[in-house]
């Protein structure tokens, strides 16, 4: 049985969450296949993707348990309900929108709420967020995460925004439970050209690097 706890565990085990902003609804499916082939199975389809709920539904139906498909850039309640109705296993908001937590938990799904400051991060966690999205991570860096977790060690932090191949190690060493990866993986050139072999190759670099770092720490 799929539960919010099992989904959170799967996301932590996956380690990398691909943040997908597809050009079209149809593009999300081959894109997701390419990510899976490269070893990345956690896929966050953002609401900046046209017809995002339909994209979530199609990818979930086609990939089944091979992927952990969620919805990203969720800022309104109607988006949250649409994502859950489409089969999203997790919901991600880039902002501190605690009102989304209850409906997601009522559906027995996981939610990641955005935060920037220590107060926002702790508020998200105390309000019931399963994970706390620190965004934009490139502005703050691994040293901020490490400093944040010193007084707040229980925070399940997922940095997103600017995570690169060479920052996987410092972010994990800072105590992050998973990493959200966007444009450094799903590059504009790949999306513009539908170059899925290139995406698979790049995804493999990220997933291999994650394994290497996890084995060393």
Give, region by region, the residue ranges found by the protein language model.
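Conserved N-terminal beta1-alpha1 strand-loop-helix module at the mouth
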Residues: 1-86, 106, 154, 165-166, ...
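Glycine-rich beta-to-alpha transition loops that act as phosphate-gripper elements at the mouths
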Residues: 21-23, 49, 69-77, 93-97, ...
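Conserved functional loop/turn residues at catalytic and ligand-binding sites
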Residues: 39, 63, 87, 95, ...
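Histidine/lysine/aspartate-rich catalytic loop segments that bind and position anionic ligands
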Residues: 90, 94-139
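Glycine-rich phosphate-binding active-site loops on the catalytic face of alpha/beta enzymes
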Residues: 90-100, 134-142, 176-196
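CoA-thioester-processing core
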Residues: 104-111, 142-152, 157-159
């Amino acid at each position: 049985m799929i539960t919010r706890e099992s989904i959170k565990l799967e996301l932590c085990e996956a380690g990398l969450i691909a943040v997908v902003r597809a050009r079209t609804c149809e593009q999300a499916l081959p894109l997701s296949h390419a990510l899976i082939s490269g070893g990345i199975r956690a896929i966050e389809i953002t609401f900046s993707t046209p017809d995002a709920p339909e994209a979530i539904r199609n990818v979930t139906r086609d990939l089944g348990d091979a992927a952990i498909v969620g919805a990203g850039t969720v800022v309104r309640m109607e988006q949250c309900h649409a994502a859950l109705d489409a089969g999203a296993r997790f919901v991600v908001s880039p902002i501190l929108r605690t009102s989304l937590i209850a409906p997601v938990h009522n559906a027995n799904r996981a939610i990641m709420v955005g935060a920037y400051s220590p107060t926002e991060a702790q508020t998200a966690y105390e309000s019931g967020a399963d994970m706390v999205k620190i965004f934009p991570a490139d502005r703050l860096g691994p040293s901020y995460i490490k400093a944040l977790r010193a007084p707040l060690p229980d925070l399940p932090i997922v940095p997103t925004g600017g995570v690169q191949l060479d920052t996987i190690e410092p972010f994990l060493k800072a105590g992050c439970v998973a990493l959200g990866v966007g444009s450094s993986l799903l590059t504009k050139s790949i999306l513009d050209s539908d170059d899925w072999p290139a995406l698979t190759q790049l995804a493999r670099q990220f997933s291999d690097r994650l394994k290497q770092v996890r084995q060393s720490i």
